């Protein structure tokens, strides 16, 4: 889970600690002073530390954290600019043009996706579902793509967004930052908690929606930026596994952090990072994240696919009508999963009859090996192969 899902738990822990201390502490008896106490020196404010590479400088006042908005030139390091994560409300004095350029560059999905979009390959006519944390549906980046929005296990009265929700939706279907801006998204919001029950309920709800849709117009795939089937990370993982089996039997392709399977095809996932000087080159991508070399052993797997997970600009909205964008120098696999499902949507636009097994196998067969031997998703080669071998 990303930062906001952890934030609530952290704040709760702090609150409980403070309450417990206040309610249970018994003041010790104090003898009357016989000598006037010495004056206490006023506390000296600790010097502001310069942000380190890959620190998050986003200004998010809505939730009472990350309150610093403006950084003077001596409060950041210009050499680290492309390593910082920040949003469009962060001000780095003296580097405004550079941060604006990073935000703009991060809008590009990379790997040649924009060349496909220029040809009209946008996922038009394809229906996709997302199971993730809540979002507000009025952000112009994604509002036109949301076909339905449902909540499971969430207090709807809060009317709050999260970091995760608009980010994954915009990576998949954003109008200016997304891989497949032509898709229709059925969004199932779940709490940012390590409990698979809401995920399982959401997946079954998607199956019910599909029962109402005509043949040829059903939801094809589900993007889940989590691992609800992992018993070590999630409670009630068996509930998810049961729902997943039902979905697969119904012909729904579900991609999670644990990958996907269909017929004899199997797909596992690895993080990768754009080469900022060759953003459209899959082979130039680095294995892992910018601040982490990743699992190099993954390159030996014949069914592991590297996905771009860093240096992305994504939609951001925490309260209604406060729509913006953030630049993530370091994302994570959560950002790679909707990217991959977006590429799938492009493929189904070109080859609507493509089976789930053919989808997974073609993604692997057309991937480009990088310098480490990890096979990186190659949207252009993927689409060209489908047009040649599967398109009607």
Which residues fall in each region the model found?
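N-terminal domain-start motif of subtilase-like serine proteases
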Residues: 100-128, 152-157, 286-290, 377-378
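Acidic-leg catalytic submotif of subtilisin-like serine proteases
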Residues: 71-72, 88, 111-153, 252-256
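Bacterial lipoprotein signal-peptidase II cleavage site
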Residues: 20-28
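Substrate-binding/access-modulating region of protease and related hydrolase catalytic domains
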Residues: 52-65, 80, 123, 191-273, ...
């Amino acid at each position: 889970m990303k930062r906001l899902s952890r934030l609530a738990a952290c704040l709760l822990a702090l609150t409980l600690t403070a309450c417990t201390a206040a309610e249970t502490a018994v003041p010790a008896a104090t003898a009357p002073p016989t000598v006037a106490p010495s004056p206490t020196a006023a506390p000296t404010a600790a010097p502001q530390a310069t942000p380190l590479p890959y620190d998050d400088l986003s200004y998010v006042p809505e939730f009472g954290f990350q309150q610093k908005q403006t950084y003077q030139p001596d409060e950041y390091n210009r050499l680290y600019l492309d390593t910082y994560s920040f949003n469009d409300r962060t001000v780095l004095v003296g580097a405004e043009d550079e941060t604006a350029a990073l935000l703009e560059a991060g809008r590009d999905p990379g790997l040649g996706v924009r060349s496909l979009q220029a040809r009209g390959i946008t996922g038009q006519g394809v229906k996709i579902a997302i199971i993730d944390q809540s979002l507000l549906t009025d952000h112009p980046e994604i509002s036109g793509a949301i076909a339905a929005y449902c909540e499971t296990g969430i207090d709807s009265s809060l009317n709050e967004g999260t970091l995760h929700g608009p980010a994954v939706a915009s990576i998949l279907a954003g109008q200016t930052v997304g891989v497949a801006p032509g898709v229709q998204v059925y969004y199932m919001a779940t709490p940012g908690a390590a409990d698979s029950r809401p995920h399982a309920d959401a997946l079954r709800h998607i199956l019910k929606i599909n029962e109402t849709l005509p043949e040829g117009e059903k939801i094809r795939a589900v993007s889940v930026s989590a691992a609800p089937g992992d018993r070590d990370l999630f409670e009630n993982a068996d509930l998810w596994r049961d729902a997943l089996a039902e979905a697969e039997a119904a012909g729904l392709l579900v991609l999670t952090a644990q990958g996907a399977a269909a017929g004899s095809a199997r797909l596992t996932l690895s993080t990768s990072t754009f080469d900022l000087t060759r953003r459209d080159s899959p082979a130039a991508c680095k294995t892992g994240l910018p601040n982490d070399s990743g699992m190099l052993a993954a390159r030996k797997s014949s069914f592991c696919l590297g996905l771009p997970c860093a240096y992305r600009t994504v939609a951001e909205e925490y309260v209604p009508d406060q729509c913006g964008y953030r630049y993530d120098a370091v994302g994570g696999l959560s950002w790679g999963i909707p990217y991959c499902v977006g590429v799938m949507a492009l493929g189904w636009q070109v080859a609507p009859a493509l089976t789930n097994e053919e989808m997974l196998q073609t993604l692997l067969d057309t991937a480009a090996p990088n310098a480490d031997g990890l096979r990186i998703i190659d949207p252009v080669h993927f689409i060209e192969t489908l047009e040649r071998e599967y398109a009607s």
